[in-house]
Amino acid sequence: MAALKYWVWLAALPGVGSRVKLRLLEHFSSPEEIYYAPPEELLLTGAVDKLQAKLLADKSLTRAEDVLAACAKAGQFIVTMDDTTYPARLRDIFDPPLLLYGKGSMPIFDDEAAIAVVGTRKCTAYGLDVASQLGYELAKQGALVLSGMAKGIDTAAMK
């Protein structure tokens, strides 16, 4: 759980893009090492510029602790890139997410067909109904339904 806090810290850190975070993970063995690295050491990697090194100097773990508490309260799990359950197919894309959030059981993504349902946050009642029905019918047939879990179409598809 302690190591997870540093993954969430890194993923939630504003102003530092995901590609930079991924390059840093190539140089350091863990987000915890990135957390404790001084700005000078971060700069030596060539992965960050001075502004990004300054942003990475924000050592507040409050946001990470809040995310972990909210996930625990909601019964959600977090999968990091170094977790064995992180999908290999996802790890191989150009810009993979550092973390995956989920609820329920963690499916084996590499063995199942997956369908993503994404849409607008500002949707019509008809759109909500269609997304909800679509997500339900797909899941009923055994499909793995994925979404970004944003309010609107994404959330409706996951009900």
Write out the residue ranges for each language-model feature.
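Short, positively charged patches
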Residues: M1-K140
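Phosphate/pyrophosphate-binding betaalpha-module
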Residues: G135-K159
